[in-house]
């Protein structure tokens, strides 16, 4: 008895042969069986079949991975597990870009990463200061406990005291102490703590700056000096006192056109230093009427233009500079520094509107806004209409959401408290940290 040979059916045969369970010759355009029977030979669309099978396989894999942690690709290095290293990592990847107005261009590194972060490898003092600032920022983000930030801050303060008690310090040690003192000011800014504490650190930085005798100035020293000058003006305005002077120098002398520390032009900053000095003298009861008129004229004549080809970062710097100019004029007017008849209420309204527009433009650009606290505070205090106040609160909210620094929340609370006063005056009832 002969055994019937089992035919091997092809997976790629025509539809007729597959339905009749016959082996297909797979001839094109018609197989042998369909040709003999005189019927239409139809082959399936294998592209659709393959896609369907692939999609089904993908679904099976997805179902198998439900509830299982899947590592997603990332452009950033994995976050270190060590706490201290994690704080350095946060400062490097997040915080440094929030407190600097460096241009994101090739060959223009962030100055904090260039002049501060490398010092953490050789100086425990700078390391603790950087970690304290980063931990404070993470605390505000809800990613770290407040106790950890406090511990690191205490370590940085203790090391600072120990180092300063030494009878002699070399140049490297002094620069590390200077970097640490300035970072501790940022610690107060991030947590919105005390303008007085920040002023104490500023006074320590002043002494260290005065000890420097090297000429020409190395780049890191120029960077530290600019940070000092920025906080010198902002803290003086916060506390309504006169700025500090370095070796009797009446004010900053910057040569660069655009500055990466405070996003302002160098030609305007000496005028802001003069403004802080006059406001401080006025709070002490001094007569500044003549000098304030001169400063107002200089502020009115100062200008900076932007072109259609200006990139967003440069445009933000321009608008920040303009907001400082107009808020400086508003402060002089509100402080009663000028009673000249040529300054009318209409002019005040025009200056206010210009300051308001510049602050709003910076917000719309959605770039680093770290130096916007003071002009936003000034414009906010003068906002009287419901619409303007609504916009101001929106800018504060966006500012806080972008930077997550309590100094912004403190300024917002002070502005809202000012609005609630029955007859709000310009004088601050308590120091407001601005920086």
Language-model-derived ranges and their functions:
Residues 80, 85-86, 93-95, 99, ...:
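Acidic/serine-rich, low-complexity amphipathic helices located in mid- to C-terminal regulatory regions
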Residues 128, 178, 222, 226, ...:
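Start-of-helix signal in alpha-solenoid helical-repeat scaffolds, especially tetratricopeptide repeats
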Residues 1-109, 119, 407-435:
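Charge-rich, intrinsically disordered regulatory segments
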Residues 113-119, 129-142, 152-195, 205-211, ...:
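Hydrophobic/aromatic-rich effector regions of fungal transcription factors
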Residues 108-111, 115, 239-374, 378-401:
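Cytosolic regulatory protein-protein interaction regions
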Residues 2-6, 69-173, 350:
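Internal amphipathic alpha-helical repeat/solenoid segments
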Residues 140-149, 188-201, 238, 282-285, ...:
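Short coil/turn connectors between adjacent alpha-helices in alpha-solenoid helical repeat scaffolds
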